[in-house]
């Protein structure tokens, strides 16, 4: 009987490298597949694709697996980056990693892997898959500090049924130990933190290459103009640094935070103080929903939710989950809930899915003075 073939997404990082080694040790027929999904500035100092490929080849040679590269740059631009720009243009703050996982890593990549004769695929994500009575659940990783289920919440049954997450049961420290013990050339390589496949770079400069500046007033809730913004697309709710209005103006010493965007008036509203009422919301609305099990949780269900990555699950109640819309009411006010980000629901360790935040209702309704 031939060995089960697993195609591993190898990025050149430690996690995917250890993933490939673990599966090789378990006796699988492992094939590494390196994705190139960005090529607008291959010669830029911020583009690490060339070095990443070198690392992949070096690791593959060391652990004894075949590896090849595939170019999904066109798919990435069409399915992920175009949406990224549309969202920013509309004043929202998207999370491209969520869409990249659903459309590229677990769709385009999965399809390509199946064409290579794969039985299943594997990646270095920190999450777990559990089969229960023929259905597949997405679970948080054992190492909650590295859990990536938030970014994977749009995966469906077909995708999860063909996916392995070998690192889901171990802490990141153990992964680093394994990398050092087996002599991986990238054992000390730092984790990537930039935009999915685009890398680490000055974000405002990068965005300005694709979206024009459109200056407008920066106002306080009482209507006072205190500065000028360069374009609403370049700011996100809860932002404290880089607003360009200096320090305290009321003697309190409290920092300024971006609180609202009025797209029609091209006005950016800022408030002072981390806990200003404009930054707090008890009700969150989301659309563009995706559920791991294929159906939404029942209305009235008490669950946990994240409205941003690395946030602790916040107790909430599903007030509505019908007609393509989701409304969550939280027990405690949530801070700087940002349209464009994902609201992801959890039942304990199980990630149920979620949607894209469309709006948040402030804990205290205060109308801005124009």
Swiss-Prot record:
GO BP: tRNA wobble position uridine thiolation
Keywords, ordered alphabetically: ATP-binding, Cytoplasm, Disulfide bond, Nucleotide-binding, RNA-binding, Transferase, tRNA processing, tRNA-binding
GO cellular component: cytoplasm
Binding site for ATP: 9-16, 35, 124
One Pfam family cited in the UniProt record for this chain: tRNA_Me_trans
Chief subcellular location: cytoplasm
Annotated segments matching region Interaction with tRNA: 146-148, 308-309
Catalysis: reaction(s): S-sulfanyl-L-cysteinyl-[protein] + uridine(34) in tRNA + AH2 + ATP = 2-thiouridine(34) in tRNA + L-cysteinyl-[protein] + A + AMP + diphosphate + H(+)
Stretches for region Interaction with target base in tRNA: 95-97
Subcellular location: Cytoplasm
Active site: 100, 196
Cystine connections: 100-196
EC assignment: 2.8.1.13
Keyword Nucleotide-binding in annotation: yes
A GO molecular function held by the record: tRNA binding
Site feature (Interaction with tRNA) residues: 125, 341
Gene3D superfamilies documented for this protein: Adenine nucleotide alpha hydrolases-like domains, HUPs, Translation factors
Superkingdom per UniProt: Bacteria
UniProt family annotation: Belongs to the MnmA/TRMU family.
HAMAP family the record matches: tRNA_thiouridyl_MnmA
Function description: Catalyzes the 2-thiolation of uridine at the wobble position (U34) of tRNA, leading to the formation of s(2)U34.
NCBIfam families, per database record: PRK00143.1, trmU
Name used for this protein in its record: tRNA-specific 2-thiouridylase MnmA
Species whose genome carries this gene: Ralstonia pickettii (strain 12J)
């Amino acid at each position: 009987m031939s060995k089960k073939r697993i195609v591993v997404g190898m990025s050149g990082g430690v996690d995917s490298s250890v993933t490939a080694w673990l599966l090789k040790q378990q006796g699988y027929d492992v094939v590494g597949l390196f994705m190139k999904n960005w090529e607008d500035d291959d010669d830029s100092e911020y583009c690490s694709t060339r070095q990443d490929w070198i690392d992949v080849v070096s690791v593959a040679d060391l652990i004894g697996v075949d590896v090849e590269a595939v170019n999904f740059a066109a798919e990435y631009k069409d399915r992920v980056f175009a949406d990224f720009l549309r969202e920013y243009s509309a004043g929202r703050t998207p999370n491209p990693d969520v869409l990249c996982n659903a459309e590229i890593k677990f769709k385009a990549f999965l399809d390509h892997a199946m064409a290579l004769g794969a039985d299943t695929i594997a990646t270095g994500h920190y999450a777990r898959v559990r089969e229960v009575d023929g259905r597949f659940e997405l679970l948080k990783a054992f190492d909650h500090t590295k859990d990536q289920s938030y970014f994977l919440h749009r995966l469906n049954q077909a995708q999860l049924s063909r996916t392995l997450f070998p690192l889901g049961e171990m802490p990141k420290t153990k992964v680093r130990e394994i990398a050092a013990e087996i002599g991986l050339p990238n054992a000390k390589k730092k984790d990537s933190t930039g935009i999915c496949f685009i890398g680490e770079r000055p974000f405002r400069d990068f965005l300005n290459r694709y979206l024009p500046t459109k200056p407008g007033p920066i106002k306080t809730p009482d209507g006072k103009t205190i500065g000028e913004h360069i374009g609403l697309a370049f700011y996100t709710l809860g932002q404290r640094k880089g607003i360009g209005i200096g320090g305290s103006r009321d003697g309190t010493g409290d920092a300024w935070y971006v609180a609202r965007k009025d797209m029609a008036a091209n006005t950016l509203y800022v408030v002072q103080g981390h806990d200003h009422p404009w930054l707090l919301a008890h009700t969150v609305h989301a659309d563009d929903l995706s559920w791991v099990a294929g159906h939404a949780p029942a209305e009235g269900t008490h669950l946990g939710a994240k409205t941003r990555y690395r946030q602790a699950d916040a107790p909430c109640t599903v007030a509505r989950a019908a007609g393509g819309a989701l409304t969550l009411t939280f027990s405690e006010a949530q801070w700087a809930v940002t349209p464009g980000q994902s609201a992801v629901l959890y039942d304990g360790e199980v990630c149920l899915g979620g949607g894209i935040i469309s709006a948040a209702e402030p804990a205290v309704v205060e109308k801005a003075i124009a």
